């Protein structure tokens, strides 16, 4: 019996890992992988990690990875080739060697596309200058490492402030490079809501990173050698020895499109529950493959931080033994990074996304301890923001910014969301708790109980972003209910101070016809003040969600 031929197109590591699993499932499979360079490709998070770890010999590491795939699974890796055509009727892939220019073809029984993402090269003057990189390969990493070691890279500009941009900025900062992060949108980290992203921005600025938002790069200026030396925005001229451009990544789908493969609404390759395209025998995996969002049911394109094990299992089993395995659930777009001594994690929908989907959204923000609080060591605050459908309590999303607890909290909520859970399920979830994280309620239970109180109408909250807007446009009373000594140490502009214990005696100092926003350190005393003032007949009340500790605006 002839061996089944599997061909993988693309250097994204998901492809060769799926091939290895398929060979493990069916040893009769003969697998070949066609890649454009000398090595497989990692995503930009891992490439950024290599930048900050100067002692890591990335080429030796990747060489050993590729040798393991060859030795353990018999996979043939054909390097330095460019695929020029997919011929579904003939079941052939045509390619040419990039070094010798010769043209060849390979036949397949199953074809797997793992082409990953490619940058959209902007129409910006100077984009082709030296030392302007899109951080797409190990060669980029090595060039950056060598430039830093030689003292040639002292100032860098990172363009694009998503999670990959923030992580890349940290990698350069850890190497002693002066970093400027430039984002054309109104905030860094569009994966997070504004007030959560601002917490990260404040930390980055505190660490010495310059952060510019709402600024589009207009041009890059080079020297006589053709290397970049300046980045021009509408407001700044930024000196730069290196520019890393991370804006506007898109799935690499042109070869698939030419072969008659349907490209989905997200811009990625459309696949079914078997990860198979509309062309029988051709599958897609990784960042170039479209997924379905678990909450909205709509197609999405994911820039994954790691290999999706569930997808690899499905596609490898189907390649090995026919379409017998299906992908049961959609994705929640869960992401997390650790950067600048902060953990950042999110899952589900952001507030803006949820509203765009037509949900009536309720939010709750709490501050919880993180790290080693109870042991007398250092600790950090962890901001937790939960979003639910006001009509039924269905969980729509959660975001965390703080210490090492962030991804644990998000992972736990993501598990409940994948089961269709509600905030009531969170409130009664039996999870491992420890007094180093919470003296009373587990953080998940805490944010769930705050949310339930809101849904029951026990109090009304206001987000930091909403309060910042009100302070610019409306005359509301900002009532700080902390002690006088705490108030003197710092509060919000225009706030007045009536300590919680003095509310009854001093209630006549408050105008009942104006909106009163109650603030305290974490929001707990403000909540008690809300209850007491309601009992005194005040109606136009709200509590600052998360308290002053989580208010990120100046």
Describe each model-derived feature in a short phrase.
Residues 2-5, 288-404, 435, 439, ...:
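Mid-to-C-terminal Rossmann-like scaffold of FAD/NAD(P)H-dependent oxidoreductases
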Residues 113-175, 264-265, 270-273, 496-500, ...:
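Glycine-rich dinucleotide-binding loop and its adjacent helix/turn
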Residues 2-76, 169-192, 326, 334, ...:
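Beta1-alpha1 glycine-rich phosphate/pyrophosphate-binding loop at the start
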Residues 128-152, 238-317, 412, 416:
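FAD-site-proximal beta/loop scaffold in flavoenzymes
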Residues 155, 165-221, 300-308, 325-351:
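Rossmann-like dinucleotide-binding cores of NAD(P)H-dependent redox enzymes
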